[in-house]
Amino acid sequence: MYGRIASLGLLLIVLWSTASPAQAPASIGTVDALVGDCTVVRFGESGARALAVGTALYEGDRIRTEAGARLRLAFVDGTVVQLGESTDLALDWFLHAPDAGTQNVLLRVSSGIFRVILELVLPRAAFEVQTTTAVASVRGTDWIAEATPEATAIVALEGQVAIRNIEPALPGEVVLGPGEGTTVTADAPPTAPTVWGDARRNQFIERTTVP
């Protein structure tokens, strides 16, 4: 009896010692630059951690910039996201599989101002950014948006970006070209694209530039 128990115990020790450890989640990007106080709440955690240059980013992260802060994030697919002050960004979904030609990204901004610079989109790709009122679908472009609970203002700097209301019951989509902007309120489709003046466009650029 004791011999069997000893043998079983030895077997369990061997199996435990040779078992592969749980794989750590893969990083999807890093903090490239920041000014001021910026924090992240990891998926499954409740407390915020301070961000620093080089901090790894993971799917499920919720990121915030405080008043006066700026933040630049560099992702593994070449995308760059720049946040102005008082901005909340959630990295809801991030799949980048270049060998399979697949890219599936969903970012969510509940408030604040941000810039997305998307350099490469794979053949089978879906890259979306959601705000409180709008959904932006892109296939390689440079654009800026400011989100409040009531409305989202968006301007394209390069390329094209398709914009629609986040509510499926409000149909209608506009496609912005370089220099064009639109506004999406909670209860209406996007406004017709109009060319923004230099002052308004440059203000958006300045507010999302990280020194």
PLM features per residue range, with description:
Residues S7-S17:
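Bacterial N-terminal signal peptides
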Residues M1-R4:
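Positively charged n-region of N-terminal signal peptides that target proteins for export
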Residues S20-P211:
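Flexible, surface-exposed loop/linker segments and immediately adjacent secondary-structure boundaries
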